[in-house]
Amino acid sequence: ALDAMTKLKLQDEMLRLWQMEHITMVIVTHDIDEAVYLGQQVIVLDRHPGCVRHIYDIEQSVPRDRTSLEFHRQRDKIYKEFFRVEEKPFTYAI
C-alpha cells in the first residue's frame, strides 16, 4: 500500500512514461478514480471469472484533471455500474 501523495505521483509518472514511450499498458485496479485517470478504456468485470460486464471508453485528453466535471461524470457512471446490484430471479428446489 502507498500513501496518497506517493500514489498520485506514481500515477503521473506512469502517464509520462506512456506518453514518452508509446507503449501498451494493462493496469488492474479496484480504484475507479485510478482507472479513469490512467485508462483509455475501463473494463468492469463481472463477479463470474472472465466475464466482462461493461467497457467504457475514456475520451478525456491526457493529462486529466481529477477535479473536472467530465472526470467526475465518467467516474460516477462507472461507479454506478461497479456497485450495481443484479436482480436474481426467485428460485427454489423441492
Label every model-predicted segment.
Residues 31-33:
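The feature captures the ABC ATPase H-loop/switch
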Residues 22-28:
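Conserved H-loop
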Residues 11, 75-81:
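Short proline/glycine- and basic residue-enriched helix-capping loop/turn segments at helix->loop/beta transitions
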Residues 88-94:
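ABC-family P-loop ATPase nucleotide-binding domain
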Residues 1-2, 6:
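Short coil-to-helix N-cap segments within the nucleotide-binding domains
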Residues 7-21:
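Helical segment within the ABC ATPase nucleotide-binding domain
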Residues 47-77:
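Conserved beta-strand-loop-alpha-helix hinge in the C-terminal portion
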